[in-house]
Amino acid sequence: MKVLVINAGSSSIKYQLLDMSTGNDLASGIVERIGEEMGSISYKTGEKYTAEQPFPTHREGMVEVINLLTDADKGVVKDKAEIAAIGHRIVHGGELFFEPVEIDDKVLQGIRDCIPLAPLHNPGHVIGIETAMELFPGVRQVAVFDTSFHQTMEPKAYMYGVPYKYYEDWGLRRYGAHGTSHKYVARETAKLLGKPLEESNIITVHLGNGASISAVKNGKCYDTSMGLTPLGGIIMGTRCGDIDPAIVGFIAERTKQSAAEVVATLTNESGLKGICGSNDLRDIHARIEEGDEKAKLALDMACHKVRQFIGAYAFELGRVDAIVFTAGIGENDEIYRENCLSGLENFGITINKEKNENWDRTPSFISEDDGAVKVAIIATNEELEIANDTVKVLGL
């Protein structure tokens, strides 16, 4: 059985076709710059294929994905009818969706209703679903929400100290993000520990250009760093993370910008990029080696904020079995990991330098063998998690 996983953005479509009998990735890629004069598509099986061509809308992009998947030479299926189901990554489900759900007209409208909570993401998801429904008539489709995993938080963790009617009228609360990734690596970490997930306390650290941290207590999300939107929490590539709320008004008053314009700056021009001009850690590390103080400040600030959240969550959980790093930075940047956890030996948190610098991409611990708190690196696999949820929801 084959399941197609789609993550449609405002101008892109990430896709992956999985063989559910093995869990293997048969083909994957991305369509980018949809709606621009010239777009691009990548397609990877054993080899990688790339091409540039215009994609006026998501429909043209999806058609080309189907063409590649069924191509006589490069394809991995003879006909699109071999695709049994489609799973869609959805960033925000608000309080409407507590778990993955089969898509119908009501669900699609619910995703539209959550657009104010994820204006950069949910509109693209809606277009992706509508396009897939058109091109795959009769194929059952499932929405898997980044926010679902965090719905087990208690009100004391997800409510804000603002008038309660804002929650009643608009659903203003903490929702979190990257839930599919946090869920996947928490389960895989419990396997490493040799403990049932339901008995494991784990701090999951998802570090990519977007980043978040979750406290997982007895297998369920107890708290998470991102808030109403994916802008809150730790310092990210281009996003500010948690700041004094009055900063928005402070900037707006001095720049004569609207609140929306200030939020756009905090989303796209802040974080690491705002401090040192770059959100590429490779560039930042190189500049630090050359003595660049702003690059060092950016890295120090980001790691400082990660340490703050880990410390807070350790106290909230009471007992921490493991801390796990995942996603692009978490999996690939040994300096970042070391900076986040160095000097915490008194709390039972250690890093073995050799293990940290020579991780072989298999799920494993990088802490000292006698460390009270295990530190792991696990490559996230959100696509496989979405595909598994899709199969489970549809009973396939």
From Swiss-Prot:
This is Acetate kinase. One of its GO terms (cellular component) is cytoplasm. It catalyses: acetate + ATP = acetyl phosphate + ADP. Homodimer. GO terms for molecular function: acetate kinase activity; ATP binding; magnesium ion binding. Substrate binds at R89. The record marks H178, R239 as: Transition state stabilizer. The lineage of its organism: Bacteria, Pseudomonadati, Thermodesulfobacteriota, Desulfovibrionia, Desulfovibrionales. It comes from Maridesulfovibrio salexigens (strain ATCC 14822 / DSM 2638 / NCIMB 8403 / VKM B-1763) (Desulfovibrio salexigens). PANTHER family: ACETATE KINASE, ACETATE KINASE-RELATED. InterPro entries: Ac/propionate_kinase (IPR004372), Aliphatic_acid_kin_short-chain (IPR000890), Aliphatic_acid_kinase_CS (IPR023865), ATPase_NBD (IPR043129). GO terms for biological process: acetate metabolic process; acetyl-CoA biosynthetic process. ATP binds at K14, H206, L207, G208, N209, G210, D280, L281, R282, G328, I329, G330, E331, N332. The active site is at D146 (proton donor/acceptor). Its EC number is 2.7.2.1. Mg(2+) binds at N7, E382. The keyword ATP-binding applies. It is an enzyme of class 2 (transferase). Belongs to the acetokinase family.
